[in-house]
Swiss-Prot record:
Entry protein name: Pre-mRNA-splicing factor CWC25
Main location: nucleus
Compositional bias (Low complexity): 186-206
UniProt feature coiled coil, ranges: 17-63
InterPro entries per record: CIR_N_dom, CWC25, CWC25_splicing_factor
Subunit structure, interactors included: Associated with the spliceosome.
Record keywords: Coiled coil, mRNA processing, mRNA splicing, Nucleus, Spliceosome
Annotated function: Involved in pre-mRNA splicing.
Length: 206
């Protein structure tokens, strides 16, 4: 009887499975080669860095590999020594140097002016001041709340002017003498006096 395991797809004795294993092994070998080559390159770079750090001669400074960080190690003492040499008279001042110094002074002045302008403009109020050319600008006219308060005060003033002082004196009405008064006068004197009194007269009730 034949081996039934050969019919299984996972059987390691099959040719296709052996081929897959061999391909995976070849990939691992290639990756290991690349890793070793990269390690050798890194070691060579480190050795070059060591040799370049040991070399201090001026002639071989330019041969040094550029890493982009040279500006961190630049010494500014050379410019100071040159200025001292000019002051001591060791070097002569030419017209080109004067022109360069004048250009530098102009650039410094322009930078200072820009800084002062930037310090002045700190908000929208400064921009408004610069447009109107006034140092102290009254911005209350642009404020809606200020307008509302001013209108309210003006309205109150007009109301106070229109109000007139009223007198609390009541008009005095004299009793009228007519037919009714004669009728009460002809009778009892006490009754006529009572009817024509201040509390019962219709003119005093109103």
């Amino acid at each position: 009887m034949s081996d039934l395991n050969l019919l299984k797809s996972w059987n390691p004795k099959l040719v296709k499975n052996r081929k897959k294993v061999w391909e995976a092994q070849q990939q691992l070998v290639e990756e290991n080669k690349k890793i070793k080559e990269r390690q050798k390159e890194i070691e060579k770079e480190r050795e070059l860095d060591r040799y370049s750090s040991l070399i201090r001669d001026e002639d071989q400074k330019n041969v040094k590999r550029k890493t982009g960080l040279e500006w961190m190690y630049d010494n500014t003492s050379t410019a100071l020594t040159e200025n001292v040499d000019y002051l001591l008279g060791k070097k002569e001042i030419t017209d080109t140097l004067l022109d360069l110094s004048g250009n530098n002074n102009k650039s410094e002045k322009s930078e200072n002016q820009k800084q002062t302008i930037r310090k002045h403009y700190q908000g929208i109020e400064d921009v408004i001041c610069s447009k109107t050319n006034h140092k102290n600008v009254d911005l209350s006219s642009d404020d809606p709340m200020a307008k509302f308060k001013a209108a309210k005060q003006a309205h109150l003033k007009t109301l106070k002017q229109n109000i007139q002082p009223t007198s609390h004196e009541y008009p005095v009405h004299k009793p009228l003498r007519g037919a009714n008064s004669k009728r009460y006068d002809s009778g009892n004197g006490s009754r006529s006096n009572y009817k024509n009194s201040r509390y019962n007269n219709k003119y005093y009730r109103s």
